[in-house]
């Protein structure tokens, strides 16, 4: 396997390193070392700098405001930012650029691309995702939110839950049932809905770590243009699966770098507590190291698929299982190392839910407990590990489908 990058990608890497050196201060520890209000201010400054340098969406086509580069350059940029401990993008950007933006490029109409993509890049449109409902989580096709066509508008009524970035968004992409007479996976449509209207109410949800990273969204006679359907009316399931493929595979470019950085933090924790020679701890650290290497080579595999024009597809399920199960396991090990110290008086945590703590995050019990609690969600959101294993078994290995409960009765 040749894992070297071509000369043009390495030249782009040099450009990114120059940008990092110019915009991050000397001795930069990472945004995790900043108080929350300073972290947010610096992240906004970083976003403006990225936009000014044309680095917000380098692999999007130039006609829609992107850089027109290949996925390889996108990976190079992500690698260098991860190594430098650059601020993570806001959740709205991750949802708008990585997920919805790429889905619009793949499936959207020309009018949708020209209207929405520039506004996503500028930050004028801030997006959240409206998939899960109180009665439809892992069984996403059971959504009950209704969409009814009224002239040239869709009228939407329903209740979404576990909505990331809902409190900071002004648009939501969602699944709604537009044909209740159709089969469960049909009759769904993928709609783009403005949130700045009387029929949309957002209520934050406080999680176990005391942060409000999710929310509920209530839609009562909310309206959106009839043209704001991505894909075909009634074929929203297919559009949603395309988007979830981008979500499940979106972390692999930097997962090995991010988790390797945090593995070093875990090793430091073990040394500080005098447990780095304990056989059980060493076995856990070795397991973590092996999984980081698996993520690294899995990333090369996914990059190869992207460069040949293949969407993530069902293989994204493998990626999602690997990093989410690793996240849970290494935070378990951290709390084992801390012992009763992990249950002591709470100090400042890491400021919210993140896939991987930002560079510079303190090696404190409070931060590790925040990570432990959030790691539980990582094996559930974007499709639970059980669902991912079903996808791997049925769609990649060709195993028989799991029996449905009604068939067993």
UniProtKB/Swiss-Prot annotation:
The keyword Cytoplasm does not apply. Its cofactor is FAD. GO terms for cellular component: peptidoglycan-based cell wall. Keywords: FAD, Flavoprotein, Oxidoreductase. GO terms for molecular function: flavin adenine dinucleotide binding; oxidoreductase activity, acting on the CH-CH group of donors. Its EC number is 1.3.99.-. SUPFAM superfamilies: Acyl-CoA dehydrogenase C-terminal domain-like, Acyl-CoA dehydrogenase NM domain-like. It comes from the Bacteria. The keyword Oxidoreductase applies. Induction: Repressed by Mce3R. It is an enzyme of class 1 (oxidoreductase). InterPro entries: Acyl-CoA_Oxase/DH_mid-dom (IPR006091), Acyl-CoA_Oxase/DH_mid-dom_sf (IPR046373), AcylCo_DH-like_C (IPR036250), AcylCo_DH/oxidase_C (IPR009075), AcylCoA_DH/ox_N (IPR013786), AcylCoA_DH/ox_N_sf (IPR037069), AcylCoA_DH/oxidase_NM_dom_sf (IPR009100), Mycobact_Acyl-CoA_DH (IPR052161). Belongs to the acyl-CoA dehydrogenase family. This is Putative acyl-CoA dehydrogenase FadE17. It comes from Mycobacterium tuberculosis (strain ATCC 25618 / H37Rv). The lineage of its organism: Bacteria, Bacillati, Actinomycetota, Actinomycetes, Mycobacteriales.
């Amino acid at each position: 396997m040749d894992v070297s990058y071509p000369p043009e990608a390495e030249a782009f890497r040099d450009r990114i390193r120059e940008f990092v050196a110019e915009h991050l201060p000397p001795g930069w520890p990472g945004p995790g070392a900043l108080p929350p209000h300073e972290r947010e201010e610096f992240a906004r400054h970083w976003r403006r700098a990225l936009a000014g340098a044309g680095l917000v969406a380098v692999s999007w086509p130039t006609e829609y405001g992107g850089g027109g580069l290949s996925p390889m350059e996108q990976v190079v940029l992500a690698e260098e930012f991860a190594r430098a401990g650059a601020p993570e993008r806001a959740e709205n950007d991750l949802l708008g650029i990585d997920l919805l933006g790429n889905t619009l490029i793949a499936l959207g109409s020309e009018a949708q691309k020209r209207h929405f993509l520039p506004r996503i890049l500028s930050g004028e449109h801030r997006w959240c995702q409206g998939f899960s409902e109180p009665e439809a989580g892992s069984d996403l096709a059971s959504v009950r939110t209704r969409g009814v066509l009224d002239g040239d508008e869709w009228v939407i009524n329903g209740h979404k839950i576990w909505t990331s970035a809902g409190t900071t968004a002004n648009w939501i992409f969602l699944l709604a049932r537009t044909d209740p007479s159709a089969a469960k996976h049909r009759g769904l449509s993928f709609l783009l809905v403005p949130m700045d209207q009387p029929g949309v109410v957002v209520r934050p949800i406080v999680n176990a770590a005391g942060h409000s990273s999710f929310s509920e969204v209530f839609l009562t006679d909310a309206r959106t243009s009839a043209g704001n359907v991505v894909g075909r009316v009634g074929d929203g399931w297919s559009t949603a699966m395309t988007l979830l493929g981008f979500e499940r595979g979106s972390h692999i470019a930097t997962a090995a770098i991010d988790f390797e950085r945090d593995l070093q933090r875990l090793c430091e924790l073990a040394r500080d507590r005098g447990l780095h020679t304990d056989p059980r701890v060493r076995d856990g650290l070795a397991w973590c190291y092996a999984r980081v290497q698996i993520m690294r080579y899995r990333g090369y595999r996914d990059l190869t698929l992207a460069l040949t024009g293949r969407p993530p597809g069902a293989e994204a399920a493998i990626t999602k299982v690997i990093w989410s199960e690793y996240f849970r396991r290494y935070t378990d090990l951290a709390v084992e190392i801390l012992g009763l110290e992990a249950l002591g008086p709470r100090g400042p945590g890491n400021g919210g839910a993140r896939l991987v703590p930002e560079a510079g995050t303190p090696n404190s019990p409070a931060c590790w407990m925040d990570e432990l609690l959030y790691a539980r969600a990582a094996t559930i959101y974007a499709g639970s590990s059980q669902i991912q294993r079903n996808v791997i078994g049925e769609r990649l290995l060709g195993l028989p489908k799991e029996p449905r409960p009604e068939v067993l009765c």
